[in-house]
Amino acid sequence: MTELVTDGLSYWARQAPGRTAIVFDGADRTDYAALDRWTHAAAHFHVAAGLRPGDRVGIIGDNSLEWVVAAIGALKLGAIVVPFNNRFTQDELRYLVDDSGPRMVLADEAHRDRLASALARPPAADQDVTLLPLGAFTSLRGEHTAPMPRPQAGPDDVTQIVYTSGTSSRPKGVLFTHRSTFNLIADFAFAEPALRPAARMIYVLSMSGAPGLLWHILHPLTRGLSIFYERGFEPARTLRRLAEEKIQIMAGVPLLFEQMARLPEFAAADLSSLELVTIAGARAPVPVIRSWLDKGVLLRQAYGMTELGGISSLNPTDQAVDRPESIGRGTVFTRHRVVRPDGTDCDAEEPGEIIVSGPGVTPGYWRNEAAYAEAMRDGWFHSGDVGIKDADGYIRMVDRLKDVIITGGYNVAPSEIEAVISELPQVAEVCVVSAPDTKFGEVPAAVICADGALTAEAVTALCRERLAGYKVPRHVIIQDHPLERMASGKIARRKIRDAHPELAHAAQPVG
């Protein structure tokens, strides 16, 4: 009999029925037994609506208990869950529908009209999509229905299709199976003792993102944790929740931790309960790491991408102080290398591409074998990320290969410049992009969100002091509004560059 990704929930419903499974927005609590019953009722609802094992079901909506219940209910009957990113445009949503071919899409009220408009366009061949409200699952709470019969599933049957953000091409549907999901959970169960039954985890990012369903729904429920979901991220509320609920585990992007650290109440907040705090999605600025370290909280840099299950390596606790930028050396079963274009291993401190091999790496892309063959070569997934391995084998990520700026024959990593500029106290966000240059081919340009006290001269003066001359931004643009982000929450480097055509005309020249 194949172990299913929902078996963990059912186990804890028997083993610890009264243990809190989920606390939503600080008030709405449900225990494991109640959640198991609710998701069985959801599975029967799906069947009555026409969903069958192997069918795809799209889900779009803000964080909610109904989102969780609808997803687990679909998995219990053997359907494939396809999270639709809340921030995708109408055209992007239409692409997801056409590519994934769902039989059904569930939407909350906030996203229903946009999705309905996307579905109103001429459908793909033989495509008939039913649109249902996520709110329909609210009334199923408390129902006592018969458990959903186990589907006839194999270990390599697909359970989820999670789409990438589409930074350089159309979003790709990353596949997860029962086997790959359990491999990821087991890998980190060996490595991280904080991921233990009854531990208290908080999640403030979108459930529709790459880490949502796998890392912050299925993973904690399989391990018997108690999860505190927030409707969204609000710095003061999240900081208060960390302290009041004695949260032990949290993961987020650098911006979350930076915004909380800037709060006046941060200094007095009791965060002593935190045991495992991971920061991912981008390189964390060292000043942010230090601000939390001053409170005794180790921010541990993680590395991963959708194709790697969200996280494939995590800086060990004993390295978080001495090597704050390290992403670690891999996990128990997952290996990482840094290689040259010819596939040979780089020497220590030599930049190269990070490649990954492990049991949790995606087994493929949905309907895109060519892209998978290009990425997965000789058993190693080629990430497209530039990394550097030190003499002890610890890796630090430098940048995306495609983001590296080649100026006058020299390679420049935008993240290196961004790390320096981020040290200026007036800087809220910074993105370094390439700008065309007649002499050097391309040069670095910095687009900064900062308060009015910051000047381009201050930026370039610091960069001249800290960086080689060819790394100093030749253009500096300062704005008072946040930088544009992708649906995943990462800074949208390409969109920011395209939004500033003046960069080609020396908007803020630097000698």
Describe every region a protein language model picked out.
Residues 222, 247-252, 261-322, 335:
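Gly/Ser/Thr-rich phosphate-binding loop
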Residues 468-490, 508-510:
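AMP-binding/adenylate-forming catalytic domain of the ANL superfamily
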Residues 88, 105, 242, 250, ...:
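AMP-binding/adenylate-forming catalytic core of the ANL superfamily
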Residues 48-49, 76-141, 450-454, 479:
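Structural core segment of the AMP-binding/adenylate-forming
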Residues 182-200, 208-249, 263:
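Conserved AMP-binding/adenylation subdomain of ANL enzymes
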